[in-house]
């Protein structure tokens, strides 16, 4: 069995880790970074960029640069939070045929799992480059408060990326694993406060030694899947845009390019204000009007930022209270508070967590990496590398069915340990009813209409009888990923109907298979594209070097030799405009051979030219001094 990796698929950044022996290790990507921006861009040339390269070009290509896609995964287009998001992002959010929220870039409509699959593929490649072997399986994390549709959509993204998703694990639970694996201090109750780029979760977890096993039991979880660093950024963006409008009477919010620059600047300002008391946002030439170019310069203090986001921070406290109530604990029962997610670096957020739980949060857990590390530990458990660890997670929301009068009847209460199975007997509502519709719901409202509809199916062929007589046995079965299977059985006839819940929408099997095929085709396409780009760069460098050498040789170059090289350069330039790899390679070889002969001539002529001894000695001496200076500088850089 190959290595199972752990992936934190984040709203803003993603991270991959794996077990090395009995220690988890975070893997650096090709750029040398331990986290990768969860950004996917599509260029005019048809190239797909992922991570830092996608983020870098966002300013010039905002409509085709997709970020914070996790906020849309498994969601319906008509949901209020999606409608709010449409106003926040420069790319198009569109309604799919099945009512889901999809996105559009370069004229192509895509499902969020398809976009997220690009990020997962980059994580997979990062691990493969490190291991030197193919990776086929992963544990992927999701916010604890993700519903069934969102979990299923995340699993679909993994499959499209070419990964077998061995387990979907909740982010706070993963962070608790990262924190608690090497702690041997008896029983502990910890609160994991996870404020990331797009989501907020809080979980109350008990870590205990049970018969030699390290047991992690989630007592309760709560959260808000549309609250995170992106919302904090939006407040700063709006503030800066308003200040600029007051000063210049120009509203930047109608200009996608200016807004993308503003988004980058807001993110940087927010980060700076975690360690400084004030910062300046400087954006020269941000826009222009009839009077000329306009420059943006706005000073923001830490106090101003805190006042802008105060209500967002306060929104995290409600779920904390509910989580404690559900766990039947008070704040004083909590032994440790673990902060996870990049937004918890903000001092005011740390202060809010400290004030609520009444203790200083721990600083020895890396908020950006803890979730991926925990996923790697769970991967190690599944792969047999990590022994004596038992993880008992919970379902975040209650599950049930719609019954007479539009009521939701709960079969599985929220915070029930998973995997779990629950059966309940229902009956017909009318005389001689021969079929029942089982409408599966997730949520906490008494009214069925106020909850998330996960799907519905019919059980037919019930023998006619008085209402209340037939016995319909409904079974809910939640697997370890938190994904639901529902079955209904007529006890009299033994007839049974069942579904794996994939939401009332979600991706159909055929769509997933098409996306898997597309992804595989694109890997080959992208490889060929990259080869052509590399060849063109090689050709450009060769042309530049050859033309420079010709200039240096000047009239020392014979006319026929010069015209031959110019002809070869022209042929290479023509070849580089086409997409034929073999032809470009052949023309590069021709020019390499021609310029090698010219270089040989240049070298021979220089060697034959007599030079004054004094000057030569002086030059040599100067060269030595220069070389020494350069070398020392390089060594210093290496040391730092």
From Swiss-Prot:
Q: Which GO terms describe its molecular function?
A: ATP binding; ATP-dependent protein folding chaperone; unfolded protein binding
| Keywords carried by this UniProt record | ATP-binding, Chaperone, Nucleotide-binding, Phosphoprotein, Stress response
Q: Which SUPFAM superfamilies match?
A: Actin-like ATPase domain, Heat shock protein 70kD (HSP70), C-terminal subdomain, Heat shock protein 70kD (HSP70), peptide-binding domain
Q: What induces it?
A: By stress conditions e.g. heat shock.
Q: Where is the composition biased (Acidic residues)?
A: 622-632
Q: From the UniProt entry, list the residue stretches annotated as the region Disordered.
A: 603-640
Ranges of biased composition (kind: Basic and acidic residues): 611-621
Q: Which residues carry this modification: Phosphothreonine?
A: 199
Q: Name one Pfam family in it.
A: HSP70
* Family under the similarity heading: Belongs to the heat shock protein 70 family.
Could you tell me what this protein does? Acts as a chaperone.
User: What is the official name of this protein in its record?
Assistant: Chaperone protein DnaK
Q: Which organism is it from?
A: Nitrosococcus oceani (strain ATCC 19707 / BCRC 17464 / JCM 30415 / NCIMB 11848 / C-107)
